Amino acid sequence: MITKSNLKNTLKSAGFSDTSKDKYEKNYPLSDCSIIVDFKNEKIIYPEDKGFKVNVATTTNFSEPENFVVLECVNRLLDKGYRPENIELERTWTLGHEQKSGRADICVSNQNGKMLFIIECKTFGVEYNKEMKNILSDGGQLISYWQQERGCRWLVLYASNINSSNDIEYTTDSIDCSDDENILNLARKDATILLYKDAHTASELYDAWKETYEQRFSGDIIFRDDSIAYDIGVKPLRKKDLKDFSENDKIVNRFEEILRHNNVSDKENAFNRLIAL
C-alpha cells in the first residue's frame, strides 16, 4: 500500500524530483503542466491552472491512502498523454431513490468533452478485491456511475502499490460500456437478450452485463503499452490473453440454442452455419 511513510519513494519511482524543502514536482512535457506534492502542508497540487478539475479538496490532502492511488493514477494518465483539461476528480452524482451522493475518483473525457472512462481507485490488495466482489455481486459503484453518465465508454477499477524494491506496480480491469455488434445482431432474432441500450436503471445495466455479457472484463485497456491516449479499446488478442470456453458458459448455451432453432445438427459445419446466421 502507498502511505505517507513510503510516498517519497513512490514519487521518486514515478519520476518526481525533490525541487525544494519537502516539495516534490514532476513536469509533463506532453501537456505542459506539472504536479507538486507539498509534504510540509500535506497537499497535492494538481494543474488546475491548465484546466484540471478538482471538485472536492479532501482528495488533495494526505488524509487517506486512496488519495495516493489517485495521485499515482493521474500521473500515469498524464504520462500516457491525456491532457489535464480532460481529467476531473470527484465528480458528484445523486444515486438512487435514497438520494445518496456518489463521487467518482477520476473521470476522463475526450477532446469533445464527452465521457471516455470513469476510474474507481482503491488501495492495493484487500480494498481492490472487495470492490471487485461488489462489482460482480451487484455492479458496485462503477455501474451506478455509468447510469448517471450513459455516454461513458469504459468503466475502470484501479489500484497501485510500491513493493519492497521501490517499484510501482498496479492492477486494473475494465468493462466495455458498448453493446457488442454481434450481440445486437443476435438480439434482432431473440427479444429475450438483454442489451445495455435498453437498460434504464443501474440494476438493468448490471443484469445485461451479467446475463448477456457474462460479467466480461476487458483487462488493462488504458495503460498497457500498446494503448494510445484517447484511442483506447480492446486490442488484438494476444495468446496470453486467451481463455478457454467452458460448457457452462452462457454464450456457449446461447449458440447451441440458435443452432437448434435453425435445425443445425452437423457439428463439423456448425461454426460456418452459425456465422452465416
Predicted regions and their residues:
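Short, well-structured hydrophobic secondary-structure segments
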Residues: 55-90
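Active-site-adjacent loop/helix micro-motif of nuclease/hydrolase catalytic cores
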Residues: 85, 98-101, 115-118, 126-139
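Nucleic-acid nuclease catalytic cores
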Residues: 88, 130-194
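Non-catalytic C-terminal interaction segments of nucleic acid-processing enzymes
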Residues: 1-16, 183-243
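Interdomain/boundary linker segments immediately adjacent to catalytic/signaling cores
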Residues: 1-64
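Active-site metal-binding core of divalent-cation-utilizing nuclease and nuclease-like domains
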Residues: 18-36, 58-62, 85-113
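Long recognition/docking surfaces used for binding and targeting
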Residues: 276-277
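Conserved catalytic cores of phosphodiester-cleaving nucleases, focusing on short active-site segments
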Residues: 73, 104-110, 115-128, 145
